[in-house]
């Protein structure tokens, strides 16, 4: 028996010895990062990269994806033009790209913790000296997927994890020697060695100059130097500046846009709770032309690059005055409501709870549970206007015959990025001006319903809340983040980020697949299901100045933050995809409150995404966002409600009494001068604290 065991042991030893000898005979395949100092192409020296920018300028000099076939090369040029027309340099929200010089590397050969190595094989580091997170390591997700890069098989595509990158910061992507599994061996190229060398070259190139921050960092941290096999250095731009500059400009010129006419009481919309008054406002249109299918329609700019009204339109607006509440000395607190795509000015009164399936008039006929009456319960007046790209604009002012339902979606046409950005600017700027026009209004007794308790109606200049639904929520977010006069609170319902995903991931109909096939010649799901696809990066740069998440993220970390935030989301939203919901929440770096709906698929859950950027899920949140400059604390919370089975989750703010009660509590707290609390059902007095019944 012992002899048999000895024989078996010897056999196993010889077997392993034989394998090890064979392994030693396999030469590793060297892999290097493509670094061509003479090229301005995306895949020749990495993207984004500071060598593509002229010194002291934010714009870069290269196309996104040279060599792409028609029609993507046509779209690419439009997005590049949009980025350099309204953009502010490299977007903080984008995918990073670099190419290896071996064509046969598969995605399975990436070595990343925790599956492959105990140490980091790839990381992102902030190189901005003096920054709060200088030298801080950031985790990333990476792929070598060939989708979107058929001609270049080994393209490394990387997305930063956690909180968004910040504007005007220099970052480095560092890829280490053990990033690839055998038989491949990643190693620094001669060009990279020169770029990272402390020895100055005889002639300094743009590429060498762009790597200077990394050389300085490695000089202070020499332990990294030997292991770095690939690196990318770039500085994020300031895409939020463009819209902020335009907002500041229209505020300075707002007095010339305050002409209005009060037409009188709207008896059909008025109820025992609210008196509805209709008026018209002479509102500016800042676009040089409306979007015409594939024709771009941009902003009308003066010689200084600031918006100038192309024309003045007479548009409808409505005011809701509480019938039973006495007006406070300083005026009624004001809720400004912003409807969504194809919405009408009357939706603050007509959009309410639908009690049975199959109703098609849920946006046009007055219903209980509407914003006007919910706000009136807390003593708030409401103002709403006919927005650009709303139903009224489409039926009256659109530059071509079109139906009200299809007109607004022209503004989301992926083939016209200039229009996508300019349309968003128009909607934000008119909201900024509308607020100031409404503030100037005083209604006398003869202009009010006879049942109104007050003999006059005006509006408190220091208590403004803005609420938006769907696209309206995106506009509200951007307006709050760019306004010089803070809102006391904002309420975002059916909310998501503004960008390409509105078109490609429009949930109600399968429009994404149609656009993938028609515009991008891609297979269904090739783009919509793949955040690494270059089309997304193309849009993230081209549409960056209208990226609401970027505006909100800058705002929450700024001295200007002085506003409470409530976000109401629904499961299985038919209009806004989970991807766009999560992007907005990431921009806010917001905590989730309430009870997470049960039995959700992973794609619908918000909690995992919230945890990736360091926030929490609690039963109740209050005063959880601190302005580090002023020391003041504000409530920022999101609640996710289940759809009610009648309409999709896009409508929960109107369909569910619990959601209406939530924003009612929010308004009540603000009126009382308290910090609101956002909490689950069962929390006692959520307008004042977070005491909950377990």
What are the roles of these predicted feature ranges?
Residues 415, 419, 423-426, 485-489, ...:
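C-terminal subdomain of alpha/beta-hydrolase-fold enzymes, centered on the catalytic histidine
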Residues 25-291:
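Acidic, low-complexity Ser/Thr/Gly/Pro-rich repeat segments typical of extracellular/periplasmic
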Residues 17-20:
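N-terminal signal peptide c-region/cleavage motif recognized by signal peptidases
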Residues 109-113, 134-136, 168-171, 182-195, ...:
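Short, solvent-exposed loop/turn and secondary-structure capping segments
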Residues 1-9:
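Bacterial N-terminal signal peptides that target proteins for export
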Residues 291-312, 328-453:
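Cap/lid segment of the alpha/beta-hydrolase catalytic domain
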Residues 263-330:
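N-terminal cap/lid segment of alpha/beta-hydrolase-fold proteins
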Residues 441-504:
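Primarily recognizes the serine-hydrolase "nucleophile elbow" in alpha/beta-hydrolase
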């Amino acid at each position: 028996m012992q002899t048999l065991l000895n024989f078996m042991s010897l056999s196993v030893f010889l077997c392993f010895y034989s394998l090890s000898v064979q392994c030693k005979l396999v030469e590793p395949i060297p892999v290097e990062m493509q670094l061509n100092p003479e090229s301005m192409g995306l895949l020749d020296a990495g993207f984004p990269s500071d060598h593509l920018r002229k010194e002291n300028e934010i714009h870069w000099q290269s196309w996104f994806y040279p060599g792409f076939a028609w029609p993507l090369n046509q779209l690419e040029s439009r997005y590049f033009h949009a980025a350099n027309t309204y953009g502010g340099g490299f977007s903080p929200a984008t995918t990073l790209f670099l190419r290896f010089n071996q064509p046969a590397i598969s995605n399975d050969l990436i070595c990343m913790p925790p599956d492959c190595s105990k140490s980091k094989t790839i990381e992102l580091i902030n190189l901005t000296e003096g920054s709060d997170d200088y030298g801080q390591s950031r985790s990333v997700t990476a792929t070598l997927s060939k989708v979107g890069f058929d001609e270049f098989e080994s393209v490394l595509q990387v997305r930063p994890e956690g909180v968004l990158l910040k504007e005007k910061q220099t970052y480095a992507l560092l890829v280490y020697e053990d990033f690839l599994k055998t038989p491949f061996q990643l190693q620094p190229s001669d060009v990279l060695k020169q770029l990272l060398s402390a020895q100055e070259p005889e002639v300094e190139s743009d590429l060498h100059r762009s790597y200077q921050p990394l050389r300085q960092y490695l000089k202070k941290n020499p332990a990294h130097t030997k292991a770095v096999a690939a690196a990318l250095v770039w500085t994020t731009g300031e895409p939020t500046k463009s819209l902020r500059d335009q907002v500041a400009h229209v505020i300075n010129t707002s007095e010339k846009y305050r002409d209005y006419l009060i037409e009188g009481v709207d008896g059909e919309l008025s109820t025992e709770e609210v008196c509805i008054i209709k008026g018209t406002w002479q509102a500016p249109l800042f676009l040089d032309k409306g979007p015409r299918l594939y024709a771009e329609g941009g902003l009308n700019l003066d010689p200084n690059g600031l918006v100038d009204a192309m024309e003045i339109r007479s548009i409808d607006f409505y005011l809701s005055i509480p019938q039973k509440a006495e007006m406070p000395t300083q005026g009624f607190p004001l809720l400004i409501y912003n409807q969504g795509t194809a919405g009408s000015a009357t939706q603050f009164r007509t959009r309410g709870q639908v009690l049975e399936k199959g109703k098609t008039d849920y946006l046009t006929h007055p219903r209980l549970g509407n914003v006007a009456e919910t706000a009136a319960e807390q003593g708030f007046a409401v103002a709403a206007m006919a927005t650009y790209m709303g139903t009224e604009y489409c039926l009256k002012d659109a530059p071509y015959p079109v139906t009200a339902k299809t007109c607004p979606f022209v503004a989301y046409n992926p083939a016209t990025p200039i229009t996508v950005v300019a349309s968003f600017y128009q909607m934000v700027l008119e909201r900024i001006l509308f607020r100031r026009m409404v503030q100037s209004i005083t209604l006398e007794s003869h202009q009010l319903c006879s049942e109104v308790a007050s003999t006059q109606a005006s509006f408190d200049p220091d208590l403004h809340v803005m609420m938006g639904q769907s696209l309206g929520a995106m506009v509200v977010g951007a307006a709050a983040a760019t306004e010089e006069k803070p809102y006391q609170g904002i309420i975002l319902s059916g909310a998501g980020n503004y960008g390409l995903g509105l078109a490609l991931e429009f949930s109600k109909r399968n429009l994404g697949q149609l656009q993938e096939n028609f515009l991008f010649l891609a297979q269904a799901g090739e783009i919509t299901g793949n955040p690494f696809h270059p089309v997304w990066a193309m849009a993230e740069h081209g549409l960056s100045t209208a990226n609401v998440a970027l505006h909100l993220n800058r705002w929450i970390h700024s001295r200007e933050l002085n506003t409470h935030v409530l976000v109401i989301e629904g499961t299985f939203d038919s209009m806004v995809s989970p991807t766009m919901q999560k992007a907005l929440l990431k921009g806010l770096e917001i905590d989730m409150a309430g009870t997470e709906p049960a039995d959700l698929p992973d794609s619908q859950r918000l909690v995992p995404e919230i945890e990736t950027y360091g926030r929490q899920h609690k039963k109740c949140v209050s005063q959880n966002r601190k302005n580090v400059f002023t020391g003041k604390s504000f409530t920022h919370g999101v609640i996710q409600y289940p759809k009610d089975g009648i309409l999709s989750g896009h409508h929960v703010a109107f369909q569910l009494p619990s959601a209406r009660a939530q924003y009612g509590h929010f308004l009540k707290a603000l009126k009382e001068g308290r910090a609101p609390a956002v909490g689950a059902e069962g929390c006692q007095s959520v307008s004042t604290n977070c005491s909950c019944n377990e």
